[in-house]
Amino acid sequence: MMSTELMEGLTEALNPAAVEKLAISEPQWLRERRSHAWDVYERTPMPTTKLEEWRYTDLKKTLDLDALKLSTAESMTDQATWPARLRAAMDEDRDASGHMVIIDGHVVHTDIDEGLAAKGVILESLHDAVAKHPELIQEHLATEAVPAEEGKFAALNAALWNDGIFLYVPRGVALELPIRVTRWFSESATAYFSRVLIVAEHSSQVSYVDEMLSDDFESQTMTSTAVEVIAKQNAQVQYVAVQRLGKGAFYQSVQRTLAHRDSTLDTLNVALGASVTRVDLNARLLGPGANSDMLGLYFGDGDQHFDFNTSQDHTVPNTSSDLLYKGALDGASHSVFRGIIRVYPGAQGTDAYQTNRNLLLSPNARADSLPNLEIEADDVKCSHGATIGELDAEAKFYLMSRGLPLVQAERLVVLGFLGEVLSKLPLGGVVEKVSRVIEHKLAHQG
């Protein structure tokens, strides 16, 4: 059982002294922001299963904050010492406008196309950006998108983030190739806190791919990420997160996207690893003509647990969103999808859809799907749907009649089922990489 002290979030490693240590050399405004976040964290109760948004994820059973320490790893700038899996992932991501590599919370490599840098594109560690671009960071970091008040974990992250990523695209600048970030985690019994801040100015265009990797952990490790993506008027932004963490990882991510007038802001969350995954994704449509496509793909085996909590907030007239989350579950894995479309008063002309589909590959696998609508306008087109089913017998029979063995036929059906998500955001390299990981998991099913 958790102690009362732990339920309020105070542990041997997570405490005001840790916040002060991180803030000691930071500007006053950031010190105050961290301190405020810790105050919010302390007074915000730890989520329990009594809350609808946490009903299927019991933190008493899935997260032991008291056993976690903050990272003590040294910065690894020598590429020869980097893990082989990390280097392999980077080798697959050569086609890019820029790269960043983060190992155990330290940014150890950054490069950006010289022509884009000359146009004002910024790709930097968040610590460097605080020093070099204080006005931009102060305006956007933990303010409108993911403030500390967003929740218990958002407050903890805002107080204890160690480093992160800042990507800025000036007005009218288009990046033809994606920005690729590769993160590696190695320490067991550790809590990692990082942030992603992306600002795309008027009529800019950018794609961002964030891949998280680790081997299996000997004891539980938590990776906490707060993601803030801001698309100004007429900007086009794609945000992709590929989570491939090892067993023993508790992956927690709070993501908020802000889409202004006539902008397009699409997201893709791929969850293949970690023992426990919790993603809170909120898309806010803030200007007429704004659009957001929200895609998700997950594949579970063993006793993996996935919990996706999504919301589509249509705050003004004539905005659109379309969510599609699909997952395949084997072994005793469990997925939870909870989604809501909110149409605010006066937001006429809203066009919003939400679909969650699950494929159960084992009698012990489980999926819970809870789509919902909250509509306060009358001239709207909104729908939601959810399905939970088994492998299509007719599809398997057809493939077997063409000479394929049963196991191979089942793999093709699963790949086809999940492939619909990837086909909607065919970003170079991502589709192939994710497909390979899914094939590997399918090939190793018991």
Give the residues covered by each predicted segment.
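N-terminal amphipathic, basic helical "cap/leader" segment at the start of enzyme domains
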Residues: M2-A155, L324, L329-D330
